[in-house]
Amino acid sequence: MRVVKGRVLDVAVDIRRGSPTFGRHVTVELTAENHRQCFIPRGFAHGFAVLSEEAVFQYKCDNLYAPQSEGAIIWNDPAIGIDWQVPAADVILSEKDQRHPTLAEAPELFDYSVDYYA
């Protein structure tokens, strides 16, 4: 994941049950100027907030899109405590993204003991 125009807060959350870092997150600011990139491994939830008026992303995936494998957690889960750097009143979400469960309520997550790259 990288940003070629604008400014984005990129977030990854460990959703591997049994992981010593389960439920913890990391954030990194990606901009066209800082040239940072972020790798989101399997077993991590990914989200972002656009911090500029507009942004253009480039990203690479290790597999084809598979909607049947898609899952998500709600962006503002208080147990995770992400500072999105955007006032909640200014957040724009799709209808779909408004209905996601919290991490504790999420039905199917990754298992830390499984190698998802094998």
Q: PLM features: residue spans?
A:
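Active-site region of the double-stranded beta-helix
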Residues: 1-32, 51-118
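Beta-rich strand-turn-strand
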Residues: 30-39, 44-49
